Amino acid sequence: MGTYYIKQKVFSFKDSFSVFDADQQEVYRVKSKLFSLQDRLTITDLNDQPLVEIKQQLAFLKPRYIIEENGQQVAEVTKNFTFFKANFSLKPQNWSLDGDVWSHQYTLTDGNEPLMHVTKKWFTWGDTYEMQIEDESHLLTYIAVMIVLDMVLHNNNGSFSMDGGGGE
Protein backbone atom coordinates (compact mmCIF):
# COMPACT_ATOMS: atom_id res chain seq x y z
CA MET A 1 0.00 0.00 0.00
CA GLY A 2 1.23 3.50 -0.82
CA THR A 3 0.42 6.91 0.60
CA TYR A 4 0.32 10.02 -1.57
CA TYR A 5 -0.75 13.61 -1.00
CA ILE A 6 -2.33 15.98 -3.50
CA LYS A 7 -1.82 19.59 -2.47
CA GLN A 8 -3.44 22.52 -4.22
CA LYS A 9 -1.25 25.53 -4.86
CA VAL A 10 -3.07 28.46 -3.31
CA PHE A 11 -1.70 31.55 -5.02
CA SER A 12 -2.17 30.57 -8.64
CA PHE A 13 -4.32 32.04 -11.43
CA LYS A 14 -5.20 28.53 -12.57
CA ASP A 15 -5.81 25.15 -10.99
CA SER A 16 -2.43 23.86 -9.93
CA PHE A 17 -1.52 20.93 -7.69
CA SER A 18 1.54 19.02 -6.57
CA VAL A 19 1.57 15.31 -5.75
CA PHE A 20 3.86 14.09 -2.97
CA ASP A 21 4.82 10.61 -1.83
CA ALA A 22 4.76 9.40 1.79
CA ASP A 23 8.20 11.00 2.36
CA GLN A 24 6.81 14.39 1.22
CA GLN A 25 8.90 14.29 -1.96
CA GLU A 26 7.18 15.87 -4.95
CA VAL A 27 6.57 13.21 -7.62
CA TYR A 28 4.08 14.84 -10.06
CA ARG A 29 2.59 18.21 -10.93
CA VAL A 30 -0.89 19.05 -12.19
CA LYS A 31 -1.50 22.19 -14.24
CA SER A 32 -4.51 23.63 -16.02
CA LYS A 33 -4.74 25.79 -19.10
CA LEU A 34 -5.07 29.43 -18.06
CA PHE A 35 -7.57 30.48 -20.74
CA SER A 36 -9.82 27.57 -21.58
CA LEU A 37 -13.60 27.33 -21.86
CA GLN A 38 -13.56 23.78 -20.55
CA ASP A 39 -11.47 22.35 -17.75
CA ARG A 40 -8.36 20.71 -19.13
CA LEU A 41 -5.54 19.66 -16.86
CA THR A 42 -2.26 17.86 -17.40
CA ILE A 43 -0.40 15.64 -14.96
CA THR A 44 3.33 15.96 -15.61
CA ASP A 45 6.52 14.53 -14.24
CA LEU A 46 8.97 16.87 -12.48
CA ASN A 47 10.51 17.77 -15.86
CA ASP A 48 7.08 18.99 -17.06
CA GLN A 49 6.71 16.06 -19.46
CA PRO A 50 2.97 15.35 -19.89
CA LEU A 51 1.80 11.97 -18.60
CA VAL A 52 -1.98 12.25 -18.30
CA GLU A 53 -4.61 14.63 -19.73
CA ILE A 54 -7.91 15.32 -17.97
CA LYS A 55 -10.55 16.82 -20.27
CA GLN A 56 -13.99 18.07 -19.28
CA GLN A 57 -16.81 17.01 -21.59
CA LEU A 58 -19.85 19.23 -21.93
CA ALA A 59 -22.76 17.83 -19.98
CA PHE A 60 -25.99 19.37 -18.76
CA LEU A 61 -26.61 17.68 -15.40
CA LYS A 62 -23.81 15.17 -15.01
CA PRO A 63 -20.23 16.43 -15.21
CA ARG A 64 -18.12 14.07 -17.29
CA TYR A 65 -14.35 13.90 -17.72
CA ILE A 66 -12.07 11.91 -19.99
CA ILE A 67 -8.70 10.71 -18.68
CA GLU A 68 -6.07 10.00 -21.33
CA GLU A 69 -2.59 8.51 -21.11
CA ASN A 70 -0.36 8.74 -24.18
CA GLY A 71 -3.32 10.04 -26.21
CA GLN A 72 -5.42 6.95 -25.38
CA GLN A 73 -8.55 7.16 -23.26
CA VAL A 74 -8.10 5.11 -20.08
CA ALA A 75 -11.20 6.22 -18.19
CA GLU A 76 -14.38 8.23 -18.38
CA VAL A 77 -15.46 9.72 -15.05
CA THR A 78 -19.12 10.71 -14.63
CA LYS A 79 -20.63 12.38 -11.58
CA ASN A 80 -23.92 10.74 -10.69
CA PHE A 81 -26.81 12.79 -9.31
CA THR A 82 -27.04 12.20 -5.54
CA PHE A 83 -28.13 14.12 -2.48
CA PHE A 84 -25.38 15.12 -0.05
CA LYS A 85 -22.94 12.49 -1.27
CA ALA A 86 -20.24 12.24 -3.85
CA ASN A 87 -20.81 9.43 -6.31
CA PHE A 88 -18.84 8.98 -9.51
CA SER A 89 -18.70 6.07 -11.93
CA LEU A 90 -15.69 5.18 -14.04
CA LYS A 91 -15.84 3.37 -17.35
CA PRO A 92 -14.64 1.02 -18.75
CA GLN A 93 -13.26 -0.11 -15.37
CA ASN A 94 -16.64 -0.32 -13.59
CA TRP A 95 -15.07 1.47 -10.65
CA SER A 96 -17.07 3.65 -8.30
CA LEU A 97 -15.96 6.62 -6.19
CA ASP A 98 -18.25 7.25 -3.24
CA GLY A 99 -17.99 9.53 -0.27
CA ASP A 100 -19.38 12.09 2.07
CA VAL A 101 -18.95 15.71 0.97
CA TRP A 102 -19.26 16.91 4.58
CA SER A 103 -16.57 14.70 6.14
CA HIS A 104 -14.50 14.63 2.92
CA GLN A 105 -13.80 10.91 3.03
CA TYR A 106 -14.00 8.93 -0.20
CA THR A 107 -13.40 5.37 -1.36
CA LEU A 108 -12.69 4.17 -4.88
CA THR A 109 -13.84 0.58 -5.35
CA ASP A 110 -13.90 -2.13 -7.97
CA GLY A 111 -17.10 -3.93 -6.99
CA ASN A 112 -16.58 -4.53 -3.27
CA GLU A 113 -12.78 -4.37 -3.54
CA PRO A 114 -11.31 -1.09 -2.22
CA LEU A 115 -8.69 0.45 -4.50
CA MET A 116 -8.09 3.77 -2.76
CA HIS A 117 -9.17 5.60 0.40
CA VAL A 118 -9.05 9.38 0.41
CA THR A 119 -9.32 11.88 3.24
CA LYS A 120 -9.26 15.63 2.85
CA LYS A 121 -6.94 17.15 5.42
CA TRP A 122 -8.40 19.92 7.54
CA PHE A 123 -6.68 23.17 8.47
CA THR A 124 -4.23 23.17 5.59
CA TRP A 125 -3.28 26.02 3.28
CA GLY A 126 -5.20 25.05 0.16
CA ASP A 127 -6.86 21.69 -0.34
CA THR A 128 -4.80 18.67 0.65
CA TYR A 129 -5.95 15.10 0.06
CA GLU A 130 -4.31 12.02 1.54
CA MET A 131 -4.60 8.98 -0.73
CA GLN A 132 -4.10 5.45 0.63
CA ILE A 133 -3.64 3.28 -2.45
CA GLU A 134 -3.88 -0.51 -2.35
CA ASP A 135 -2.21 -1.17 -5.73
CA GLU A 136 -0.07 1.51 -7.35
CA SER A 137 -0.32 0.09 -10.88
CA HIS A 138 -3.04 2.67 -11.69
CA LEU A 139 -1.52 5.52 -9.67
CA LEU A 140 -1.82 8.19 -12.37
CA THR A 141 -5.47 7.29 -13.01
CA TYR A 142 -6.18 7.51 -9.27
CA ILE A 143 -4.53 10.93 -9.11
CA ALA A 144 -6.60 12.08 -12.10
CA VAL A 145 -9.81 10.85 -10.42
CA MET A 146 -9.00 12.88 -7.31
CA ILE A 147 -8.35 15.99 -9.40
CA VAL A 148 -11.75 15.50 -11.08
CA LEU A 149 -13.40 15.15 -7.66
CA ASP A 150 -11.81 18.39 -6.47
CA MET A 151 -12.85 20.25 -9.63
CA VAL A 152 -16.45 19.07 -9.45
CA LEU A 153 -16.87 19.77 -5.74
CA HIS A 154 -15.32 23.23 -5.93
CA ASN A 155 -16.19 24.53 -9.36
CA ASN A 156 -19.50 22.73 -9.94
CA ASN A 157 -18.70 23.19 -13.66
CA GLY A 158 -22.05 24.78 -14.45
CA SER A 159 -24.00 21.69 -13.48
CA PHE A 160 -26.97 21.48 -11.15
CA SER A 161 -26.12 19.68 -7.92
CA MET A 162 -27.81 19.12 -4.58
CA ASP A 163 -24.81 17.59 -2.86
CA GLY A 164 -22.62 20.43 -1.72
CA GLY A 165 -20.89 20.59 -5.08
CA GLY A 166 -20.91 24.34 -5.50
CA GLY A 167 -17.87 25.25 -3.51
CA GLU A 168 -16.92 24.90 0.10
For each of these PLM feature ranges, what is it?
Residues 1-168:
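Intrinsically disordered, low-complexity proline/glycine-rich segments
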